Amino acid sequence: MPAITLPDGSRREFDHPVTVRDVAESIGKGLARAALAGRVDGRLVDLSHRIDDDVQLEIVTDRDPDGVDMIRHSTAHLMAQAVKELFPEAQVTIGPVIENGFYYDFAYKRPFTEDDLKAIEKKMEELARQDFEVHREVWDRDEAIRFFLEQGEQYKAEIIEDLPEHETISVYKQGDFLDLCRGPHVPNTGKLKAFKLQKVAGAYWRGKSDNEMLQRIYGTAWPDKKQLKAYLHRLAEAEKRDHRRIGRAQNLFHLQEEAPGMAFWHPKGWQIYLEVQEYIRRLTRGHGYQEIHTPQLVDRSLWEKSGHWDKFQDNMFITESESRDYAVKPMNCPCHVQVYNQGLKSYRDLPLRLAEFGSCHRNEPSGTLHGLMRVRNFVQDDAHIFCTEDQIQQEVADFIDLVFKAYNDFGFDDVIIALSTRPDERVGEDALWDKAEHALEEALNRAGLEWQLQPGEGAFYGPKIEFTLKDCLGRTWQLGTIQVDFSMPGRLGATYVAEDGSKKVPVMLHRAILGSLERFIGILIEHYAGALPPWLAPVQAVVLNITDRQGEYARRIEKRFRERGLRVDADLRNEKIGFKIREHTLQKVPYMLVVGDKEVENNTVAVRTREGQDLGSMAVDDFLQRLESEIARLGRSNSED
């Protein structure tokens, strides 16, 4: 008879088989009411799951991330039930959980409208209130295929046909609705109390463009209405900060259909781009990196040697010339090895740090493109360090310092660090993996950093550290990485002469601080809601004359500031001063310098900030000093000086 071990180490013994629900009820009525599922020996199961043997059991509630995912998954099924009741001819396909929500793909004869979404959501609320029990059943494969074909659900039948022969075919029933699913699910629809349908988008069946186009309905679901409301508020705030909207409003960049996934940078946006690029250039140059530049178009033979032709070909732009196949480079690493390979290298030459603002192209599906965040053409602040095994730890430690300086200078201080270790399928001896993983771990520990371990998540060619930023809305963005590579240098013939005269293959460290510059600028725009720190702002101050009498004075101030390398404009238009102030405030210019007859007489400027603060009258030299001091702080606040 089963003995159940609970998370606190206590044991409960039963003289008969029990369900997860039975155990929850034996612990307490409150837990039984809150229970959504169980985790039996680490495996997530329904509350109705029967336990016959001794196991370790955790009761899963909506305070558990798995519990929240179950709510979202079950809400996707609730949506499918509502769609079938309202649109019986619709076919149901797949509906997984995604970050903060879920989606379900449907095949239907016409596009779903906004009114349809409202009707579906209303029907979902009605079905949830009916509090249907959710039952799991195991079916025979042929019986399941026959049932779904009879119901007109061809996609479900196809899914079952493609499952491995040994796979258990389980279905879940709630009310009159029945759906194919591995589960687990919440025990009844009454547990689904806080959800919102968000949008409809197109999606190909199984993600293949030669398959049918389906309709994907996205939604979000939360344990309670308070959390839902907070999430919708964050979404609304994110919408205000959308870099695409701000990019148009501030005339920074645009995208158009003739070049999908590739940005057209306008003068002000390009100024931001150059400032970010130049910052990284100065930072890396000061840490011993040498900047290089490599070709955009490279013969397929190099990509075959590196392994990218076999593994990455679908994401490459390929062309042919004079009977030779070329690929526009999707990454820079094989080209950097070619630079390393020019000339004999000694152990005295290592570590060798090669950096490039490498322009890469990847043939991302058009449906995944999103402003600057997901593009087809991007520039990486890419670098590769060629070193010995014994140099890994110091190089990683130096890179960690570099990363944190950069993030702090850009105004980010909340960084999540993850160490990914060896997967089951890998190259290289275990002793080498031991050494590399220890070096990465030791570098993190010596820096006094908190980090998360991701066992088995490393690449097949080496372990890695990933750096993820949190922005002002609490969203996470994976940016920096340093990746140990035991494979590529050997594949591409990289060697060095060791101290004992033997030839050895160097270790290669792939590393980036920002990753895609385009994506990082999109993150910056949203983090600051377009109000970039003065050092990054495309226009740092604007001089505004009240009447034509101050025009010459305004031009002299503009000229003087520009001679100091500052980005200052003079707006001499014949417009009311209030209009000009409002316009430049909306453009998020950090400072507006108003000049009238009094300012001309006293050689001063009346300073206003984009936040609406009136700093009063300042001598031109005093404001110049203030602005230069603020720029020198970069993205750091006064308290960090």
Curated annotation (Swiss-Prot):
It comes from the Bacteria. Binds 1 zinc ion per subunit. Its EC number is 6.1.1.3. Zn(2+) binds at C333, H384, H510. Transmembrane segments: none annotated. Its cofactor is Zn(2+). It is found in: Cytoplasm. Belongs to the class-II aminoacyl-tRNA synthetase family. NCBIfam families: thrS (TIGR00418). Catalyzes the attachment of threonine to tRNA(Thr) in a two-step reaction: L-threonine is first activated by ATP to form Thr-AMP and then transferred to the acceptor end of tRNA(Thr). Also edits incorrectly charged L-seryl-tRNA(Thr). This is Threonine--tRNA ligase.
